Amino acid sequence: MFGPAARFPYDPKAAYIPADAPFEVLQKLHGRLGIERAVIVHASCHGADMRVTLDAIARSGGRYRGTAIIDESYGDLEFKKMHDGGIRGVRFNFVRHLGGPPEMGFFNRTVERVQAMGWHLILHLDAADLVEFDALFRKIRVPMVIDHMGRVKAADGLQQKPFQVLLEWMKQDNFWVKICGAERVSSKGPPFTDAVPFGRALVEAAPERVLWGTDWPHPNVKWMPDDGALVDLFPLMVPEPALQQRILVENPESLYGFQGR
């Protein structure tokens, strides 16, 4: 979600300032798509000001959880407030267009904090980062969710080094992946079906640690997707009804603490 800026101002240091895409619009989208529960990924354009995400979770009547972006000012009180407000993870943007990798001392301290909270990390990476930070991430034992299928490029094929690294990560029981962002993985554009084999391969690797999401409202994309069309890609990646139930319902219940956890 973005804004509205009049109530939830954007970070003046943000890499991008989007048009408002507030809670009310998200509600309409979820109603149209038939989505009952969701995880709000706090947007980098709001910086470490978590008010917009905490407000949405509070207004959701228990249907939403969220992930955070933090800075060095966050201590015990802030983490307790976020946990009580439905936050269950901290996201780091390694991608260069959003500022690049974090300061490693801060990153390592946050890993320790996340472990103590029983949360997880969300890693937003470019394909090259999967190779560059391979050794670092393999040493971390807290749960880690890799966003957007690692932002690999479909044109480079399933055998490309970054995707093979991602598949190796999925052999460790603390790595998770989101099979979202087909519009970012695709090299051909709509309907983004060239991203489907990547999602399918990840599901085959570890269906018990795969998540799905819309990635709405799709900032910084070359092709603005239709959200209904993105939903239609899901059964192409996951044709089995039992695995659909697992990925859409059971996996997020486990990781994000729905139903009171």
Residue ranges and their predicted role:
Residues M1, G31, G105-F106, T110, ...:
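A generic "structured core" feature
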Residues C45-A128, A135-R138, W176-A182:
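Active-site gating/metal-coordination segments in enzymes
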Residues M1, A43, M149, T214-W216:
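Active-site metal-binding loops of divalent metal-dependent hydrolases
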Residues E103-W212, G260:
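Catalytic pocket-lining loop regions of alpha/beta-barrel enzymes
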Residues M1-A48:
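An N-terminally biased module of ancient metal coordination in phosphate/nucleic-acid-related enzymes
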Residues A48-Y64, V196-A206, D227-L236:
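Short, electropositive alpha-helical surface patch
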Residues H30, T53, M82, V90, ...:
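Conserved, mostly hydrophobic/aromatic
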Residues I17-R37, A201, P207-R209, K222-R261:
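Mid-to-C-terminal alpha-helical segments outside catalytic/metal-binding sites
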